[in-house]
């Protein structure tokens, strides 16, 4: 049985003409000379490297669909009918006290200075992609009122059109980063936090120093990769001027916008977007320890580490050196990938799947514990969207796994809520929404709960944030029922 059929996918806007397809190659069994399209090979014949990336950029998120032999769906949660655990010691255990809605869903992470979460989930890294930028207000306020952490991803300062440098070439002013942080803080209530992620370019630009000195952030995140790819992050650029600007700032821009032939091709319309790529930092134990010490000297009380779906060696390094460095949270992101823009073949065919990666992580965590080493708090990531899978990851990972990082699963409610607000203003509600009502109060099932809490401030809460909060309430209830 094939785990994935190549050569055509909705994410790339490609499909096979033939009803029958060779299973290994994904090529139509009857490939016609004169075919008008459009499989991957057909489209790649004249659009080339464009066909590597899901699209259109800035309008979609994409998730790999390779179906691995084993995942969290292959195990079930085991219940019991005698007694209950977790109730206060002086509680009479019985049908009146062991009720699901009393379950405490809070968790925390951190080596010394803990961060509390109302739910054992937090967002994936929302960085310089257009999806993250355009929806930030919805995502950030939604996370804040839900009491969870939001991760501001890589390259936000470096991509800021209004970025200003000091005389040493470091960040002096970044209005976009300021907006990101201030938006979350406006509704922060003591649960969760905003942490900023750093890659090679961010380090060179002095992003850590900027967010520490101007915003007094407690936490910074180092990045060793992700589950979607083993290269640095990328976005698309729609103008030649923007491509030249970012190349000047030190980014890899392809094709090279400084070449005359490339400029001519862009101006003639042969291609309409440039690719901006980030560098992937090389890792070592000494390097991690030195960088963590440097960041603590800068002023951060917490340093977290995000690592990807690399080999067992890199995972062991992250856990061992993370322990030595007293990392506050180690996020382990498995394959396959979810993305705003990552190469589609790599998202499907690279890296260790999340379930397998967690099995390795638990083996290494127990080995560290047997050696008398403290295991850093761990979060798993990679393909999570529902409370049942989160429950399984926490149960398998107990007591080391404290939370689950959810990428698209937490972005979707923000985008749905945002669009409901837009459709209401336009008077263009689709039937899938209007069957529940014609006003925000009718459509959002818990709207009045939020209004009772925030009163006049409701006008400051965008509908996308209401969507995330509403999803979080469903997650909480479902999670309580499982517990």
Protein language model regions, located:
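Conserved, well-structured core domains of diverse proteins
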Residues: 1-119, 131-144, 149, 161-162, ...
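Hydrophobic faces of well-ordered beta-strands that scaffold small-molecule active sites
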Residues: 119-124, 148-154, 192-198, 218-224, ...
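Active-site beta-loop-alpha junctions enriched in small/polar residues
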Residues: 126-128, 155-157, 197-203, 225-227, ...
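Active-site-adjacent beta->alpha loops and helix N-cap segments on the catalytic face
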Residues: 132-133, 160-181, 202-209, 230-238, ...
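Phosphate/diphosphate-binding loops
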Residues: 189-213, 356-359, 363, 433-437
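Glycine-rich phosphate/ribose-binding loops and adjacent secondary-structure elements
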Residues: 266-455, 459-466
């Amino acid at each position: 049985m094939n785990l994935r059929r190549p050569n055509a996918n909705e994410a790339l806007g490609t499909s096979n003409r033939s009803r029958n397809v060779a299973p290994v190659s994904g090529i139509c069994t009857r490939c016609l000379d004169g075919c008008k399209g459009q499989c991957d090979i057909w489209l790649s014949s004249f659009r080339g490297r464009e066909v590597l990336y899901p699209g259109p950029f800035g309008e979609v998120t994409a998730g790999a669909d390779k179906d691995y032999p084993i995942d969290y769906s292959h195990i079930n949660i085991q219940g019991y009918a005698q007694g209950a655990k977790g109730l206060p010691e002086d509680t009479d255990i019985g049908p009146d006290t062991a009720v699901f809605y009393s379950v405490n869903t809070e968790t925390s992470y951190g080596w010394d200075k803990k961060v509390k979460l109302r739910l054992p989930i937090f967002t994936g890294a929302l960085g310089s992609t257009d999806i993250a930028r355009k929806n930030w207000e919805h995502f950030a306020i939604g996370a804040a009122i839900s009491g969870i952490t939001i991760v501001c991803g890589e390259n936000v300062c470096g991509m800021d059109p209004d970025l200003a440098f000091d005389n040493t070439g470091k960040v002096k002013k970044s209005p976009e980063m300021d907006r990101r942080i201030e938006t979350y803080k406006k509704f922060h209530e003591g649960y969760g936090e905003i942490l900023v992620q750093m890659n090679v370019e961010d380090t060179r630009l002095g992003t850590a120093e900027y967010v520490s000195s101007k915003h007094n952030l407690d936490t910074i995140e180092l990045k060793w990769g992700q589950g979607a790819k083993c290269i640095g992050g990328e976005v698309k650029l729609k103008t030649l001027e923007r491509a030249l600007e970012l190349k000047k700032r030190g980014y890899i821009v392809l094709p090279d916008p400084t070449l005359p032939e490339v400029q001519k091709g862009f101006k003639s319309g042969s291609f309409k977007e440039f690719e901006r790529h980030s560098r992937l930092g090389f890792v070592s134990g000494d390097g991690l320890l030195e960088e963590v010490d440097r960041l603590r000297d800068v002023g951060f009380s917490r340093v977290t580490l995000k690592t990807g779906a690399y080999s067992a060696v890199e995972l062991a390094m992250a856990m061992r050196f993370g322990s030595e460095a007293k990392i506050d949270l180690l996020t382990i992101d498995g394959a396959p990938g979810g993305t705003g823009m990552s190469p589609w073949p790599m998202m499907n065919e690279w890296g260790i799947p999340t379930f397998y990666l967690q099995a390795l992580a638990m083996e290494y965590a127990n080995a560290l514990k047997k050696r008398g080493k403290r295991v850093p708090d761990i979060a798993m990531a990679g393909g999570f969207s529902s409370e049942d899978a989160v429950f399984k990851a926490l149960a398998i990972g107990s007591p080391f796994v404290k939370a689950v990082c959810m990428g698209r699963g937490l972005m979707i409610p923000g985008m749905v809520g945002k669009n409901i607000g837009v459709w209401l203003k336009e008077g263009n509600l689709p039937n899938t929404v209007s069957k529940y009502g014609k006003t925000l109060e009718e459509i959002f099932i818990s709207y009045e709960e939020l209004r009772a809490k925030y009163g006049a401030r409701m006008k400051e809460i965008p509908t996308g944030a209401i969507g995330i909060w509403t999803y979080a309430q469903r997650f909480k209830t479902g999670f309580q029922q499982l517990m």
